[in-house]
Amino acid sequence: VFRPDDVIRIDPDKFEKKEITLNEYLELFQQYPSLGFDAYQRLYAALRMFGTEEPKKPWKPKRWKFLDDRIESPWKRAGATSPFEIYLYGIEEPVNEIMRYLEDACINRDAQSRFFILIGPPSSAKTDLINLMSYTLDGFGTLPEGELYTVKFNLKENSDLFYGLEEVICPAHENPLNFLPRDKVRELLKKVNEELSFTDEFDTVCIGCPHCSLNE
């Protein structure tokens, strides 16, 4: 996903809930592999979709354009619903460090166990940075490439075994790919990975949600 000059407008009135079969999801996944991204890949894809602005002077760090605030959303704080209202500058270097961390986490499972802490004096844009990252992730979720799917179990035929529940939705947004036979999902991911960059590739090791594992 690359939208260097775009502004994403979030309109909750246009949101829709849809249910599709696993086969339909697989068709969408092959069209938009980003539907299968893990949390790190989703955030990294969202923050980089607007691209970067190369510095005019070689000793200055590049600037990620999501810092310009390219999201129009009714959920933004303090009434700043329009784009370009939370323009951040002067923090390009720490943001580059965060982006390098996310890139590493996309390709290295061990790096996902790390965490970063924003340390700085009052009014140094720590909260605004996290808010911008959150708004940008919200905007990514409104795109076809950023839709987020989870799994719903139909328990009608065995509801007596689940205290009368007729359906259960995964609380952890389980990746539907984890419900494919392991040999099939490895074959599918290998095929998809051939067309992706290294930060977008999928790990063929699937770890299922414990809650959903009990319902399989």
What do these predicted regions represent?
Residues V1-E24:
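N-terminal accessory nucleic-acid engagement/regulatory domains that precede
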Residues I20-E216:
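Conserved ASCE/P-loop NTPase catalytic core
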